[in-house]
Amino acid sequence: GVILDWVPAHFPRDTFGLSAFDGTCLYEHFDPRQGSHPHWGTLIYNYGRPEVKNFLIANALFWAKEYHADGIRMDAVASMLYLDYGKQDGEWVANIYGGNENLEAIEFLKHLNSIFKKEFPDALLIAEESTAWPKVTGELDDEGLGFDYKWNMGWMNDFTEYMKNDPIYRGAHHDQLTFSMVYAYSEKFMLSLSHDEVVHLKGSMYTKMPGTPEQKMANLRLAYAYQMVHPGKKLLFMGQEFGQEKEWNEKQSLSWELLEDKEHLQLKNYMAALHAFYKANPALYQLDEKPEGFEWINGMEWEKNLLIFLRRTRKKEDTLLVICNFSNVEYDDFRIGVPYPGKYKEMFNSDAESYGGTGVGNPRVKMSKKTECDERKNSITVKLAPLSVQVFSYTKPETGAASNKSAKAKTAAKAAAEKKTGKKGKPAGKTEEAVKAVKAKKTTKTAQKAEKKVSEKTVKTAEKKQGTTT
């Protein structure tokens, strides 16, 4: 699909554009406190004018109708919602109620989203909104703005800052990992590692990672896997999937030659496998917007840099146990509490050798034991790879009733087999008495044959003696 980055928040001052279009402030406000954005040096649309609103709405519909865009990501929505965004005292004008909310822009966004959804119900509307404005993805009839998703700027900033730290120091910043789950269900969020994070001397995702080249790759595999197992929809900026080393420059092509290196090719293949795993497991996306789709097992292991949690659907058998190790330490026989007794099998490991990792993992299925851990009655012991995400599937054990049923089935099957073939090679359908009768009959015949032979021998001997006497 194609999602357009659409900017209804402001426009440049270039005189060949919309600025002073007919020699007057046609699209912008006349008052610079309302029509100028000092933070970016741009002009702000006058959302109070019907002509301006119609122009913008028609433009959005044009992209969807004529170019079949699958969605629109609206840039800088926060700057539209607040009259004082990026401004100092005296640089902005309050609304009719004396507040800093831009009432005209709010009404414009609601109107736009309402019309757009009627025309293109399957297209996505995404807001890049960086504040705590309520109900950005709320329904229009519930005083919401009507967007499908909100860019999770908080997660993006916190997570990238956390990953920049050497694993030795990550424990002190553990809250940057866990805080996103405090507000994860307040909106319908989209997790994006976008162009904003790889421009303006911020470096690429690869250069943000600490350590040696091998550790950078391990950190990238960890980061992308964590993004996939975290609640919310996902977006990754181009080039980061194979470890682009330079930061993004719109005037240059991506460094495709990096794919000639084994490590970068392995990362690309890893991303393909990660996406396939995501699509194959509904627990990673089905209840993204519902609290019941996520459950902490242990989110407080800050000293070990560990996060352990569950992803769920409404089916118990779809449950996934996720273990994220943000340290560069390998843990042997690490005990973890599990939600149910049963079997746990490692289904995905970001540190697999095929992806360029160390290969530390759990090839054998783990059977839970009744040993309390993490405030749960059952637990398993696993081997944790350094800088990794490991995901385990769950299979319920056979219950007592099921075991008895299985045993009865085996007994019945055995009896049927004996009835068909006969026990210990006996003819099928023969009773014990019948078998004895057959044996007795054989014995009688043998005795009769022996008796006949003895009689014949006696007669011959007698005849021989009589001939000799004569």
Task: Spell out what each predicted region is.
Residues 34, 44, 60, 177-179, ...:
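Hydrophobic alpha-helical segments, principally membrane-spanning helices and signal/leader peptides
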Residues 49-52, 56, 97-105, 212, ...:
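Residue-level preference for long, well-ordered alpha-helices that form the structural scaffold
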Residues 42, 210, 377:
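Short, flexible active-site loop motifs that bind/organize anionic cofactors or intermediates
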Residues 1-100:
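Substrate-binding/active-site clefts of carbohydrate-active enzymes
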Residues 68-70, 85-251, 279-351, 358-359:
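Conserved alpha/beta catalytic core and glycan-binding cleft of carbohydrate-active enzymes
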Residues 52, 56-63, 108, 112, ...:
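Alpha-helical packing segments of well-folded alpha/beta enzyme cores
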Residues 78, 131, 396:
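Flexible, active-site-proximal loop/turn residues at the rims of small-molecule/cofactor binding pockets
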